[in-house]
């Protein structure tokens, strides 16, 4: 019975997480950093510390070694690397006057190309980025602006790897002072290299990291009672911009929906019953999709019962005639005949174990 629910629950959880990101557009990641809420101040502190440490230690989470690890070579490729093949670069946004818009989407454009850092030399990467800038903005004032921002972004990376190791770990705990110093250094570096672009590029990340750090400090403060920690966490959250608070509420609703759906499935509520009970949390479209996933899982479960019955009958007949390897081949052939949709046979095999 546990296996029966674990697979469909996993699918629904993934669907809800993706829906949360797409529909809500949240910047605050759906991860263990949010495990510490105002009702559970003692949860996941080691994991939270590790996550924040990784982000700070690698430099804004995803950028430290992007350029520093590239081999020194001037070869420029004539085609896109495999990591970018078949994809399209994000558009560079413009404001109403034709200038490059000061928004985070500009960083997204450059980060798209930086995903191929391990496949390109610095010269090749620069050539590809420049080519795409010209392709999108040829003849516009934003062309030179985009090229200047790219140069600044590269300068940020080259200086980032030169920052000293701050020794942010003391034993098995974070050194909060060192982490704060590291965040301050990165913020200062961003301003020096990117100027006014530091805010649209790193503002949201820096705000989230500092917020996470303050939550960690509160959760780790042994002088505070659980009730005092809850109050301080509430006060800290109230300092967030209203938009961020709204997004956090949406994320919490998603988490509540996941818990509710898992319980409804354990109670063997029908797909339509699930849809009616979660539509208020998820909206009609997502609730319908969750119910459909449940409905398809019920169909699969019936198919698996039919398969298991046939497998058991054959096992009794063939037990005295086939070697173990031959028996396994027969079972695999039976799976392939009954489970025709992608992934079904593999799922059946996992339940056979």
From Swiss-Prot:
The chain crosses the membrane at residues 12-32. GO terms for molecular function: unfolded protein binding. Its main location: membrane. Disulfide bonds: none annotated. It is a single-pass membrane protein. It holds the Pfam family Lipase_chap. GO terms for cellular component: plasma membrane. GO terms for biological process: lipid catabolic process; protein folding. The keyword Transmembrane helix applies. It is found in: Cell inner membrane. Keywords: Cell inner membrane, Cell membrane, Chaperone, Lipid degradation, Lipid metabolism, Membrane, Transmembrane, Transmembrane helix. InterPro entries: Lipase_chaperone. Belongs to the lipase chaperone family. NCBIfam families: PRK01294.1-6. May be involved in the folding of the extracellular lipase during its passage through the periplasm. This is Lipase chaperone. It comes from Xylella fastidiosa (strain Temecula1 / ATCC 700964).
């Amino acid at each position: 019975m546990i296996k029966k629910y674990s697979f469909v629950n996993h699918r629904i959880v993934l669907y809800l997480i993706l829906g949360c990101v797409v529909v809500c557009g949240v910047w605050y990641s759906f991860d263990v950093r949010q495990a510490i809420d105002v009702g559970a101040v003692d949860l996941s502190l080691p994991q939270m510390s590790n996550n924040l440490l990784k982000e700070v230690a690698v430099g804004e989470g995803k950028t430290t070694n992007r350029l520093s690890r590239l081999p020194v070579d001037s070869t420029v490729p004539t085609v896109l690397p495999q990591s970018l093949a078949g994809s399209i670069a994000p558009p560079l946004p413009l404001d109403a006057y034709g200038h490059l818009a000061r928004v985070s989407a500009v960083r997204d454009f450059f980060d798209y190309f930086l995903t191929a850092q391990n496949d390109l030399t610095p010269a090749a990467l620069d050539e590809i980025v420049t080519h795409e800038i010209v392709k999108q903005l040829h003849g516009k004032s934003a062309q030179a602006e985009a090229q200047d921002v790219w140069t600044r972004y590269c300068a940020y990376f080259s200086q980032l790897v030169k920052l000293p190791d701050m020794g942010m770990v003391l034993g098995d705990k974070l050194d909060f002072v060192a982490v704060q110093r590291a965040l301050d250094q990165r913020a200062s570096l961003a301003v020096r290299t990117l100027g006014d672009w530091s805010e649209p590029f790193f503002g949201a990340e820096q705000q989230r990291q500092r917020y996470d750090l303050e939550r960690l400090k509160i959760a780790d403060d042994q002088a505070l009672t659980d009730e005092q920690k809850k109050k301080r966490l509430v006060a800290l959250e109230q300092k967030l911009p209203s938009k961020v608070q709204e997004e956090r509420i949406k994320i919490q609703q998603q988490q509540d929906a996941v818990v509710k759906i898992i319980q409804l499935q354990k109670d063997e509520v029908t797909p339509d019953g699930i849809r009616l009970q979660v539509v208020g949390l998820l909206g009609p479209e997502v609730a319908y999709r969750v119910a459909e996933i449940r409905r398809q899982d019920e169909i699969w479960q019936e198919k698996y019962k039919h398969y298991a019955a046939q497998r058991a009958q054959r096992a009794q007949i063939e037990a005295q005639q086939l070697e173990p390897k031959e028996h396994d081949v027969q079972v695999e052939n039976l799976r392939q005949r009954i489970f025709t949709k992608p992934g079904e046979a593999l799922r059946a095999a996992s339940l056979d174990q």
